[in-house]
């Protein structure tokens, strides 16, 4: 296990509009505001998303299994923001629902806003953490110093 103790820094409230890309918007806020570590909360609607719902296989490297969410539908999510070698990267897990059916996983692949998405970013200061590429797993994983 790795862990560090930090403090809550700035708290950013954002509203995303119809059709906006969730990852692009949140990562651009982090870039503009120079946020290196944060917790992220979202609530609102998704128009569509490709969602990782577990691994298709684990060997030799993790291959994600995707399911498509065709909205519009409701979403509630929690995630983290840490930099990798290219800048801020959002890691988000969400529960997405429509017509009494739900899908839980890691939305990727062009997750788009339906009507409104309310975002809260809670900056974490005083820690040294970043996403580093793990060759064995083929993924960027969190590394806390």
Spans of features found by a protein language model:
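N-terminal intrinsically disordered, cationic/polar leader segments
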Residues: 1-90, 95-145
């Amino acid at each position: 296990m790795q862990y560090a103790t930090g403090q809550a820094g700035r708290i950013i409230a954002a509203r995303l509009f119809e059709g906006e890309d969730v990852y692009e918007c949140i990562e651009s806020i982090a870039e503009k505001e120079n946020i290196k570590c944060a917790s992220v909360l979202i609530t609102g609607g998704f128009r569509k998303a490709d969602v990782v719902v577990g691994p298709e296989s684990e060997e030799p490297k993790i291959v994600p299994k995707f399911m498509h969410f065709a909205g519009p539908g409701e979403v509630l999510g929690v995630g983290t923001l840490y930099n990798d070698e290219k800048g801020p990267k959002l890691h988000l897990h969400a529960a997405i629902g429509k017509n009494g059916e739900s899908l839980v996983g890691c939305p990727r692949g062009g997750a788009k806003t339906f009507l409104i998405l309310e975002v809260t970013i809670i900056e974490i200061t005083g820690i040294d953490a970043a996403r580093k590429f793990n060759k064995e797993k083929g993924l960027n994983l969190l590394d806390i110093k």
